[in-house]
């Protein structure tokens, strides 16, 4: 969430970026936390300000006790489409899901 990128985190990320490392973010789409266009747009913009590329947005893995955070894939796809309409391509993360038995993440959008 963009609110997690405070001054302390920004300074730490700057030190890493200044060393020449490429910084990539992986976030999980969570109901009630970051499942709005405003939240995701703010996160992407804040990450870029900190020189971090918004790389992956994960569909939540089905785990016990977390069903209340699950966002439907249809809504996730809609959010990515909305991000594409208001941000440059490099600021839109790949929407992915890990599927049982698959060796790699499955790109949803």
What are these regions (language model features)?
Residues 1-75, 79-86:
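Conserved AdoMet/S-adenosylmethionine-binding subsite of the radical SAM
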Residues 77-109:
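C-terminal accessory regions of radical SAM enzymes
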């Amino acid at each position: 969430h963009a609110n997690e990128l405070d001054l302390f985190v920004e300074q730490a990320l700057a030190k890493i970026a200044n060393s020449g490392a490429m910084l990539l973010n992986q976030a999980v789409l969570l109901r009630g936390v970051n499942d709005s266009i405003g939240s995701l747009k703010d996160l992407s913009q804040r990450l870029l300000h900190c020189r971090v590329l918004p790389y992956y947005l994960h569909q939540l893995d089905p785990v016990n006790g977390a069903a209340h955070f699950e966002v439907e894939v249809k809504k996730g796809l809609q959010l990515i489409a909305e991000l594409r309409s208001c941000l440059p391509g490099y600021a839109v993360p790949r929407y992915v899901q890990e599927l049982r038995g698959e060796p790699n993440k499955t790109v949803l959008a």
